[in-house]
Swiss-Prot record:
Keywords: 2Fe-2S, 4Fe-4S, Biotin biosynthesis, Iron, Iron-sulfur, Metal-binding, S-adenosyl-L-methionine, Transferase. One of its GO terms (biological process) is biotin biosynthetic process. Binds 1 [4Fe-4S] cluster. The cluster is coordinated with 3 cysteines and an exchangeable S-adenosyl-L-methionine. PANTHER family: BIOTIN SYNTHASE, BIOTIN SYNTHASE, MITOCHONDRIAL. Belongs to the radical SAM superfamily. Biotin synthase family. [4Fe-4S] cluster binds at C101, C105, C108. The gene is bioB. Pfam families: BATS, Radical_SAM. The keyword S-adenosyl-L-methionine applies. It comes from the Bacteria. It catalyses: (4R,5S)-dethiobiotin + (sulfur carrier)-SH + 2 reduced [2Fe-2S]-[ferredoxin] + 2 S-adenosyl-L-methionine = (sulfur carrier)-H + biotin + 2 5'-deoxyadenosine + 2 L-methionine + 2 oxidized [2Fe-2S]-[ferredoxin]. InterPro entries: Aldolase_TIM, BATS_dom, Biotin_synth/BioAB, Biotin_synthase, Elp3/MiaA/NifB-like_rSAM, rSAM. Catalyzes the conversion of dethiobiotin (DTB) to biotin by the insertion of a sulfur atom into dethiobiotin via a radical-based mechanism. This is Biotin synthase.
Length: 360
């Protein structure tokens, strides 16, 4: 049964005010379905921004209440279609530098602090980067990103210069591929050099909420991540930023992260599901219920109606329910293989996407 909660600032959820205005009755669980429709219509017709309290109330729908969850999923899908249409965006990445990362992110196979047996190598050549970029472009990807391990590019001019050379080289030898970059904590000056090299989007996840982040990483702060996002936006880069579900956070933490992303005006939100890596502190984390993941995705669509919600690493954890994500808010995906885990083929993803009526 759904229960009333007090908001952070005191008082009751708007849900109860809505019910009082409607019939002056005490809230009953059966009315949740009507409230979902009420919120959906306000978002579509009034460009309404839902509150933290409303989002948390939606999160209380039990994971086994399929009737109510399907109403939530359908509402999220309608919001997606109104604000984003049927276009589905596909991006790809290459692990361009692997291992020996100085940071202690507890989920990561590439941290020097943990013994995971991951591959270790330096920055790849521009020729290999171009080969992978062209292969992905030919298979139908819209975007391609180099991803490098390490804290960031601050104070690493040699690596920055090499990356600039690689991005320019890819840009000169591809036609439609949009270039993205993921290189950790960066100054405006370093990011401007990436812009000048042809990079259009910078990826830098928040990973979790401000409250929970110290449980994930202590070698840099949540504000370090936010400042890098602000630096990227300041030099004209689009920003791709999201997080990982299954780190041990609560669903309220996921909602708080989404609200921070909304405040930062992020329009591409990667949604990862933890793949526990042996040797990391999170190797024994419990898996999140697939329907809780789908419920969270739907709530993200209510919070960020205009954004690309992007399936990324770990979506295989959803199993047969992964396709449902494309009917409850997802409208983009990282396709192909991920950094240190196996993904899906571009062709397989394209087939599924088209079967569900999207345009690529």
């Amino acid at each position: 049964m759904l229960k009333e909660k007090n908001s952070a600032g005191g008082g009751k959820f708007n849900f109860f005010n809505f019910l009082k205005e409607k019939d002056n009755n005490q809230a009953e669980p059966s009315n949740v379905k009507e409230f979902i429709s009420y919120l959906k219509n306000k978002i579509i017709n009034e460009k309404y921004e839902i509150t933290r309290e409303e989002a948390i109330f939606l999160s209380q729908i039990p994971n086994n209440d399929m009737e109510t969850l399907n109403i939530l999923f359908n509402a999220a899908d309608q919001i997606r279609e109104v604000f984003c249409g049927k276009y589905f965006d596909l991006c790809t990445i290459i692990n361009a530098k692997s291992g020996k990362c100085s940071e202690n992110c507890k989920y990561c196979a590439q941290s020097v602090h943990f013994k995971t047996g991951t591959d270790v190598y330096g920055l790849i050549s521009k020729e290999l980067a171009l080969y992978e970029a062209k292969r992905n472009e030919n298979e139908g990807a819209h975007r391609f990103s180099l991803v490098t391990s390490g804290r960031g590019l601050n104070g690493n001019e040699k690596e920055l210069d090499k990356l600039v050379e690689i991005y320019k080289y890819i840009g000169e030898h591809t036609s439609k591929l949009e270039l993205c970059a993921s290189h950790g904590i960066c100054t405006k000056e370093a990011l401007q050099k990436l812009v000048d090299a042809g990079v259009l989007t910078y990826h830098h996840n928040l990973e979790s909420s401000r409250r929970f982040y110290p449980n994930v990483c202590t070698s840099h702060s949540y504000d370090d991540r936010i400042n890098t996002i602000k630096n990227a936006k300041a030099v004209g880069l689009d920003v791709c930023s999201g997080g990982i579900f299954g780190l041990g956070e609560t669903i309220e933490d996921r909602i708080d992260m989404a609200l921070d992303l909304r405040a930062l005006e992020i329009h591409s939100v990667p949604i990862n599901v933890l793949t526990p890596i042996p040797g990391t502190p999170f190797e024994n984390n419990e898996e999140v219920n697939p329907f809780e993941i789908l419920k969270t995705i739907s709530i993200y669509r209510f919070i960020m109606p205009k954004s690309f919600l992007r399936y990324c690493g770990g979506r295989i954890k959803l199993g047969e329910h992964a396709k449902t994500g494309l009917r409850c808010g997802i409208n983009s995906a990282l396709t192909g293989n991920f950094l240190t885990t196996t993904g899906t083929t571009i062709e397989t993803d394209k087939k599924m996407i088209k079967e569900l009526g999207y345009e690529i």
